[in-house]
Structures are given as structure tokens and as C-alpha cells.
């Protein structure tokens, strides 16, 4: 027997709106990478260590990209904390364990910062493995 749908509450609507904004932000970030000749290999990849927003490749370079949407680019830049960087690195290691053919590629951790005003900034090498 199927469960009835959850009630439509303000909290549920906020969560749905946040999810939709996140998807739209990742689409914008993917477009930034694709404009630089990257091919998107994965989006919103969940691992036991955490989620990878975007995994992209261009030639012999593999990029794990975190997408941050905030009111301003400055707020987006401040939102990438050490603990989150460590989770991203751990998730990237799990991704590479599942895709050993990609392990020989050069690897970089980027961030794409998006402001709600439409601004975008691609931070290449936003953080390192030492995290």
C-alpha cells in the first residue's frame, strides 16, 4: 500500500525551493566549466564520505568542483569551511577508488562561487589535498 504524500507545509516548501535553487546553481556552474571545454562526468555524486557537486574532465585534468550559492560572491567564498573541504577530499578519494582509470590524471579541487545577483567566479585550485 502506497504512503500518502507528506503534507504541504511552509517548511516543506522552503526545502523544495532550496533544492530547486541548488539544482539551478549546479546547472550554472556546469555551464561555466563546459564553456572552458570541461566534460561533466558526474553531478551531485553521493558517497559515504559526502557529496561531490560536480566532477569534470578536460584532457588530462580531473576537477572536483564545489558549488556555492549565496547572496553575494563574498558570502559564497566564506562558506567553504575546512571540515567541508575534508569531506570533499574524502569523497573524491572514494570516487577515484571506484574509477581507477581516472587515478593517473592530474587532479584539482575547484569552487564555483555564485551570487544571487547573477555573479559567478571560478576559483581554480580553491583548496589542496592537505585541506
From Swiss-Prot:
One GO MF term attached to the UniProt entry: nucleic acid binding
One family name in Pfam for this protein: UPF0102
The organism of origin for this protein: Azorhizobium caulinodans (strain ATCC 43989 / DSM 5975 / JCM 20966 / LMG 6465 / NBRC 14845 / NCIMB 13405 / ORS 571)
Family: Belongs to the UPF0102 family.
SUPFAM superfamilies tied to this protein: Restriction endonuclease-like (SSF52980)
HAMAP family xref list: UPF0102
Protein name: UPF0102 protein AZC_4471
InterPro entries cross-referenced by the UniProt entry: Restrct_endonuc-II-like, tRNA_endonuc-like_dom_sf, UPF0102_YraN-like
Superkingdom of source: Bacteria
PANTHER family the UniProt entry points to: UPF0102 PROTEIN YRAN (PTHR34039:SF1)
Amino acid at each position: 500500500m502506497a504512503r500518502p504524500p507528506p503534507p504541504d507545509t511552509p517548511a516543506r516548501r522552503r526545502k523544495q525551493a532550496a533544492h530547486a535553487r541548488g539544482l539551478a546553481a549546479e546547472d550554472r556552474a556546469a555551464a561555466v566549466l563546459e564553456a572552458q571545454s570541461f566534460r561533466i562526468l558526474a553531478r551531485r555524486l553521493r558517497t559515504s564520505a559526502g557529496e561531490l557537486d560536480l566532477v569534470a574532465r578536460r584532457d588530462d585534468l580531473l576537477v572536483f568542483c564545489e558549488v556555492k550559492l549565496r547572496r553575494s560572491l563574498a558570502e559564497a567564498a566564506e562558506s567553504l569551511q575546512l571540515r567541508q573541504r575534508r569531506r570533499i577530499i574524502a569523497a573524491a578519494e572514494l570516487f577515484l577508488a571506484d574509477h581507477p582509470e581516472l587515478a593517473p590524471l592530474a587532479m584539482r579541487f575547484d569552487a564555483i562561487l555564485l551570487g544571487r545577483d547573477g555573479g559567478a567566479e571560478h576559483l581554480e585550485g580553491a583548496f589542496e589535498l592537505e585541506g
